[in-house]
Amino acid sequence: MNLIQELEKEQFDKLSAGKVIPEFGPGDTVIVNVKVVEGERSRVQAYEGVCIGRSGGGINESFTVRKISYGEGVERVFPLLSPMIDSIKVVRRGKVRRAKLYYLRDLRGKSARIVEKKQDRPAKVVAGAAE
């Protein structure tokens, strides 16, 4: 590894220490708990929406979350390793065939829904079939 890769790996390890980052991707509904500082007080605010894309890699990776608030579409970009992110929770997995879901910006109502990904079930074992 060259020097830049070593420095990035050190930073990545330092920033991700103690953080649990679940695996999620475009189409997944996530709740991002964000630390908000108002004056001297600090609180945690939940931001729930659909992940419409991830970009970058390593310490520069970020993801975009879209939600509808009071009839208006709101998108927010979060750096994955930001110290302002308290936690990330995946609520449901979406079945999509694109890496970037920017087409959701033009859709409203039922057409903007994303089908939930079905859980893979283990194969049924038929008694005596293997013999």
Swiss-Prot record:
This protein is located at the 30S-50S ribosomal subunit interface and may play a role in the structure and function of the aminoacyl-tRNA binding site. This is Large ribosomal subunit protein bL19. Belongs to the bacterial ribosomal protein bL19 family. Pfam families: Ribosomal_L19 (PF01245). It comes from the Bacteria. GO terms for cellular component: cytosolic large ribosomal subunit. It comes from Rhodopseudomonas palustris (strain BisB18). InterPro entries: Ribosomal_bL19, Ribosomal_bL19_CS, Ribosomal_bL19_sf, Translation_prot_SH3-like_sf. GO terms for molecular function: structural constituent of ribosome. SUPFAM superfamilies: Translation proteins SH3-like domain. GO terms for biological process: translation. Keywords: Ribonucleoprotein, Ribosomal protein.
